[in-house]
Curated annotation (Swiss-Prot):
This is Glutamate 5-kinase. Residues 280-358 form the PUA domain. It comes from Cupriavidus necator (strain ATCC 17699 / DSM 428 / KCTC 22496 / NCIMB 10442 / H16 / Stanier 337) (Ralstonia eutropha). Its main location: cytoplasm. Catalyzes the transfer of a phosphate group to glutamate to form L-glutamate 5-phosphate.
Length: 372
């Protein structure tokens, strides 16, 4: 088995908090120097690399003299603001030793949910890569409260992979890779060398919490691989403690767990829809509509909608869920939530008489709909 990284031309590397900090006590400059050296060699080998790095909050805690990670959102935001300065400085210094320029890019979920901002971010990152710059990306912890409380950079790594149409995502952690159970609790746990990304069995294998400094457990990495696979990118989950792990992966050595993407990828527009993390509304659809969407590749008509939940405007991305609340698809709605409530369960021929106008005969056209 050969590493999928060997054939990848555009790679997103996510480095966790434990791999760039001294047990949460500020940044580990020596470790960051080693990451810079390895990425520099990948660049020489002709690969484009985007780095997603944690560590801002841990560095901020060190600079502010805080021993324990605070629980208050505003204190976490303050630590992130202070720490981001140090994180950017260290990376700039270490990459500069190899004549490589770096760029700091701070993103929020909102940046990727808005279509225009999404395209702007994509253009910026692709331009930086064309200029030979290594973008160093982090979530903008200072302004996004829900990211600090619930988010993780594994998800961000997958989103960035899809954003730039990367070939592979490498998630480096303090674990060897994926096991069938938590090896710290179950001595019978088996290591998983390779699997198909996005299967329910993988999610069942994944454990929960991570370390006290980082926020992501193995489940977030499994879900990140599932998300990246939608754009055709393979994911490798490996230990960042392995010597020269990036160089060895690029040379073809199989290290860690490889989660392979199924054949085929979503179009860029449908990938953008699939990557929405926060949706303002959803529609409950009947079994007939579920069948038409999942098997027939049809559009969603108002007659198949049994309930409208949340408040949304025309042109927003909404979820389509079955009677049990399971999301089966999402897409761009042709009608607002208020309009959708009026035309739900009605044939398309009655839309104009009910609303006084007809935008489209479909609530969501199949070209603007993606299965999840």
């Amino acid at each position: 088995m050969q590493s999928v990284i060997a054939q990848a031309k555009r790679i997103v590397v996510k480095v966790g908090s434990s791999l760039v900090t001294n047990d949460g006590k500020g940044l580990d400059h020596d470790a960051i120097a080693r990451w810079a050296a390895q990425i520099a060699k990948l660049r020489v080998a002709g690969k484009e690399v985007v780095l997603v790095s944690s560590g801002a909050i841990a560095e901020g805690m060190q600079r502010l003299g805080w021993v324990r990670r605070p629980k208050e959102i505003h204190e976490l935001q303050a630590a992130a603001a202070v720490g981001q300065m140090g994180l950017a400085q260290v990376y700039e210094s270490q990459f500069g030793r190899y004549g490589i320029r770096t760029a700091q890019v701070l993103l929020t979920h909102a940046d990727l949910a808005d279509r225009e901002r999404y395209l702007n971010a994509r253009s910026t990152l692709l331009t930086l890569l064309s200029l030979g710059v290594v973008p160093i990306i982090n979530e903008n912890d200072t302004v996004v409260t829900d990211e600090i409380k619930f988010g993780d950079n594994d998800t961000l790594g997958a989103l960035v992979t899809n954003l730039i149409e990367g070939d592979a995502l490498v998630i480096l952690t303090d674990q060897r890779g994926l096991y069938t159970a938590d090896p710290r609790k179950d001595p019978a746990a088996q290591f998983v060398d390779e699997a198909l990304a996005g299967t329910p069995e993988l999610e069942a294998m994944a454990g929960g919490a991570g370390t006290s400094i980082g926020r992501g457990g193995m489940l977030t990495k499994i879900l990140a691989a599932k998300r990246a696979a939608k754009s055709g990118a393979h994911t490798t989950i490996a230990s960042g403690r392995e010597a020269n792990v990036l160089e060895r992966l690029a040379a073809g050595e199989a290290i860690g767990t490889q989660l392979l993407a199924p054949t085929g990828r979503l179009t860029a527009r449908k990938q953008w829809m699939a990557d929405h993390l926060q949706l303002r509304g959803r529609v409950v659809i009947d079994n007939g509509a579920v069948e038409k969407l999942t098997s027939g590749g049809k559009s969603l008509l108002p007659i198949g909608v049994t309930e409208v939940q949340g408040e949304f405007a025309r042109g927003e991305v909404i979820a389509c869920v079955d009677a049990q609340g399971k999301e089966v698809a999402r897409g761009i709605t042709n009608y607002s939530s208020a309009e959708a409530r009026l035309i739900a369960r009605k044939p398309s021929s009655e839309i104009e008489s009910v609303l006084g106008h007809l935008n489209e005969p479909e609530l969501i056209h199949r070209d603007n709909l993606v299965l999840v």
